[in-house]
Each structure stands twice: as C-alpha cells, then as structure tokens.
C-alpha cells in the first residue's frame, strides 16, 4: 500500500502538481455503516512506522509525513499512537477535523515542534446559510487559534 502513495506522488508530479505532505488516511477513525477503513492505534503505528515512513524516506524524501486525519476526540487512542517515539521521529505534523478539534490544544502542547492543519472543514448538509457561516467562523478561529497553519474547506454541491 505504501508504494501506492509513491505512485500517486509521481503521477501528480508528472501533471505539474507537487505533493509536499501526505497523511495515511482521511477520517481514519470513522466507524460507519458503509464500507470504510477504520484504524486501530496499533495499526496506525505499524503502517506509518514500518511501511509508509521508510518508503517515503527512500522514494520521496521531500514529502513530509503527517499523522491523521484525526477525526476522533479519543485522546487515549491518540496518546497510544504518540507514545511510540520511533514513530514520532518520522512525523512532521498532524491533521485534525471534526471531533479531533477537541484534543488539538493538548496534543499541540505535547508536540509544539510539529505543524498542525485542519484537514477538512465541517460542511454539514451544505446549507450555506448564516448559521453555517457562523459555525465555520468559529471553527476557523479554533483551529488557527490553536496553532494550525492551514484550514481546508469541504464543500457540498447540489449537483
């Protein structure tokens, strides 16, 4: 699977789109009724430390590895992952979204040397009304106020 990451990096580069950072999975902690790929702490550590990080280091040393996206507020789960010092030595940052925003401040205190991003805005049902705008403003304020250097939007289209 880690080779697939590198193939995507290569394919994007061929199209003139440089990739400078990857995360192993979007919403890796969603336990959904539809097919998904939820991760355990042990699986997260093993895949990133033993497979993805070494492969990126060898094939794309210019690409940073971030943990995430953390869409969970289970601090105990994230602490288990961060307790692996060998893994932490491979990481340059973390991505948070949804409930993950609740643990961002405490994680950032533990690892002030890393970069942090909001990997996906909460677009909800795509109402784009004033209430949704206020909610998004509060999210942007929270993420940037807690040290995130990037805020990414998710947009719902009607077609």
Which stretches of residues belong to each language-model region?
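Aromatic/acidic polysaccharide-binding cleft in carbohydrate-active enzymes
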Residues: 118-159
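Active-site neighborhood of glycoside hydrolase catalytic domains
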Residues: 1-128, 134-135
């Amino acid at each position: 699977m880690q080779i697939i990451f590198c193939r995507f990096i290569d394919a994007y580069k061929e199209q003139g789109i440089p990739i400078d950072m990857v995360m192993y999975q979007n919403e890796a902690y969603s336990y959904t009724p539809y097919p998904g790929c939820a991760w355990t702490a042990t699986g997260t550590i093993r895949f990133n430390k033993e497979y993805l990080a070494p492969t990126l280091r060898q094939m794309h040393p210019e690409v940073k590895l971030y943990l995430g996206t953390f869409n969970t507020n289970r601090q105990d789960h994230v602490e288990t992952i961060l307790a692996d010092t060998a893994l932490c030595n491979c990481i340059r940052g973390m991505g948070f979204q949804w409930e993950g925003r609740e643990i961002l401040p405490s994680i950032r205190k533990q690892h002030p040397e890393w970069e942090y991003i909001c990997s996906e805005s909460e677009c909800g049902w795509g109402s784009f009304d004033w209430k949704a705008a206020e909610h998004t403003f509060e999210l942007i304020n929270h993420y940037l106020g807690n040290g995130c250097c990037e805020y990414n939007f998710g947009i719902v289209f009607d077609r």
